[in-house]
UniProtKB/Swiss-Prot annotation:
Record keyword Transport present: yes
Pfam family, one: Na_H_antiport_1
Annotated organism of origin: Geotalea uraniireducens (strain Rf4) (Geobacter uraniireducens)
GO biological process terms on file: regulation of pH
Family that this chain belongs to: Belongs to the NhaA Na(+)/H(+) (TC 2.A.33) antiporter family.
Function (record text): Na(+)/H(+) antiporter that extrudes sodium in exchange for external protons.
Catalytic reactions on record: Na(+)(in) + 2 H(+)(out) = Na(+)(out) + 2 H(+)(in)
One cellular component term from this protein's GO annotations in UniProt: plasma membrane
InterPro entries documented for this protein: Na/H_antiporter_dom_sf, NhaA
GO MF, one example: sodium:proton antiporter activity
Stored Gene3D superfamilies: Na+/H+ antiporter like domain
Entry protein name: Na(+)/H(+) antiporter NhaA
Keyword Ribosomal protein recorded: no
Amino acid sequence: MLKRINLLREFSIPLLAGVLTALVWANVAPDSYHKFNHDHFLGPLSFHFVTNDIFMAFFFAIAAVEITQSCLPGGDMSPLNKALNPLLATAGGVVGPVGVYLALNSLVGSSAFTNGWGIPTATDIAFAWLAARLIFGKNHPVIAFLLLLAIADDAIGLVIIAVFYPDPVLPVAPPWLMLTAAGMLIAFILRRKQVKSYWPYLLFGGVPSWFGLFKAHLHPALALVFIIPFLPHPTREVKHMFEEDPKDYSPLARFEHEWKIIVDFGLFMFGLANAGVGFSAMNTVTWLVFCALLFGKVTGIFVFALLGEKLGFPLPQGMGRRHLLVAGIIAGIGFTVALFVAGEAFTDPVVQGAAKMGAILSIAVFPVAMAAAKLLGIRKRGHSSS
């Protein structure tokens, strides 16, 4: 049974099921879907609010765990020179899509679409990991390179959401951020007191942080990102990203272990709440997002990684330029975070729906990457041509 559950999580089945359910529902009975998503669901709160503003706080918290662990001595981002090439590639994976999006928008788009520049900066960690494993094999160095890139991408994405996509209706109210600062101070004190359960950090640090962001009209889904680094953890990391250390019983490790399965299956809710767009909603912004993900990602990542080589920061051993090219294509799968940003970038439901469709269509990058790998003679690790 456990093996089947892990298989469902590994292939992101809950998220895909939520997306497909939302697409069918929104196209067959759009009024019913809209009513379910935006009417009262939990008391006065809508299903969309519960999903995007409360549940997604735990999604971003899991990303924050990986970033925190990766920065520890022995982690994938430590020492920094080991991570410089993938980090430079990450910068290219942001600059490239933004450049392609804005350039195409100036040629064939509209000023109404400009705010969507942040959508194609995201890389979906789960789908990128799955695609890389299927193309390269389980232990290929591309896996670690791509995961590090995706995690760093998420960190940049969090900054983009927080800084560039505040509430479009209500102005930012900075004084309320004192609540978030208070939550961080409480978490710091709990750590100094060596509190070993993660629950006090969530309740006494996370809740004020959430309300502070909410009242400041910034996105409360980022609330736990400010708290997670305070959870006690080992002074040294002995595993790679998304692996588990059976000897690590720290609050940080327990939080990830106990909440990751909830988040993985809860992504059904996210897909259901955010992917319900009509196929008729597709317009120019759909293709701006899709093309920026497909062409901008691979171009930016490839060029910046090669620049890193020229500066003396080589690719990981066993990873060549053809592997880099395919990794750049895989990174064009935006999906989860791209859907989230699309919901924040546009208030017009027609434009928002079209942008979300571009994020959903980015899953088509997967077969493009597989075809490119075949053309370049790449096989799963263990074959002589890999």
